[in-house]
Amino acid sequence: MNHLTAMSELSAAEITELLREAKAIKEGTVRHDLAGKFVANLFFEPSTRTRFSFEVAEKKLGMNVLSLDDTSTSVQKGESLYDTVKTLESIGADACVIRHSTDEYYKDLTGRVNIPILNAGDGCGQHPTQSLLDLMTIQEEFETFQGLTVSIHGDIKHSRVARSNAEVLTRLGARVLFSGPPQWQDEKNAFGTCVQTDEAIQASDVVMLLRIQNERHQTEADQKGYLEAYGLTAKRAESMKRHAIIMHPAPVNRGVEIDTTLVECGKSRIFKQMENGVYIRMAVLKRALQTNVKRGEAAYVLSH
């Protein structure tokens, strides 16, 4: 069963394969490789990029898309997530894409349902497709991860993007630096070194900004002065390496974690990340719907 719930599930070879497939899709002609398949998108947290990127990817592949949220399912009536997914499986869904506020919600599903679960973000846990599209964007720029320095700035403790990226980038040979307010450092994340903001920016090939995750804080953070203290200001951007790039998983809070003039500057790859997200999610969907042994379906072969 080709679930994708965390980056740690993927070997380096599998990551390379997904990146290669996404590149082939981007450079080639889109085919309706999954025509006739049904996918259910269950988003229990707000989402623009991930939700609609998945939906575009699914429709480009010819899939039938069922889009659901917490107001349109029986979860509102007390039904468990497992029973919801099992219901969708029973009526013919071939895969489920799920975003949920609970960390590791998928542990109650994998091994119990007979369709692939694709994690579109779990609480403060993991965001594997975001990590893959970030890898694709970095690879397009530098061709390799080996020897790169990637700094991740901001609300590290509450960021599933930071958690997914730090692990996989370290595994692929990059050095990861963390920077941000001390209270938002993640003591459990062993895949990066905490340094001062200016030092991190000057040392980096990739400067990755994160928004403040107010929805995961007990009290709303004070954003006054945050940009000058911890964000990417225009002055700090001048100290970046000549070839360095700026990334952000979005949504972007302009003027908070990044100066508004930098969002679409020459070094920015923020909207390129969003574009690459469609191709990565197409590759992930194709991987998920290769031979489903329990259903006895034919394999979908990657295109390259």
Curated annotation (Swiss-Prot):
EC nos: 2.1.3.2
Binding site for L-aspartate: K77, R160, R211
Main enzyme class: transferase
An example Gene Ontology molecular-function term: aspartate carbamoyltransferase activity
Binding site for carbamoyl phosphate: R49, T50, R99, H127, Q130, A250, P251
The keyword Transferase is assigned to this record: yes
Keywords noted in UniProt: Pyrimidine biosynthesis, Transferase
Pathway, per record: Pyrimidine metabolism; UMP biosynthesis via de novo pathway; (S)-dihydroorotate from bicarbonate: step 2/3
Record-level GO BP terms: 'de novo' pyrimidine nucleobase biosynthetic process; 'de novo' UMP biosynthetic process; amino acid metabolic process
Catalytic activity: carbamoyl phosphate + L-aspartate = N-carbamoyl-L-aspartate + phosphate + H(+)
Gene Ontology terms: cellular component: cytosol
HAMAP family, A to Z: Asp_carb_tr
Entries under NCBIfam families matching the protein: asp_carb_tr, PRK00856.1
Similarity comment: family membership: Belongs to the aspartate/ornithine carbamoyltransferase superfamily. ATCase family.
UniProt subunit comment: Heterododecamer (2C3:3R2) of six catalytic PyrB chains organized as two trimers (C3), and six regulatory PyrI chains organized as three dimers (R2).
PANTHER family documented for this protein: ASPARTATE CARBAMOYLTRANSFERASE, ORNITHINE CARBAMOYLTRANSFERASE, MITOCHONDRIAL
Purpose of the protein: Catalyzes the condensation of carbamoyl phosphate and aspartate to form carbamoyl aspartate and inorganic phosphate, the committed step in the de novo pyrimidine nucleotide biosynthesis pathway.
Protein name: Aspartate carbamoyltransferase catalytic subunit
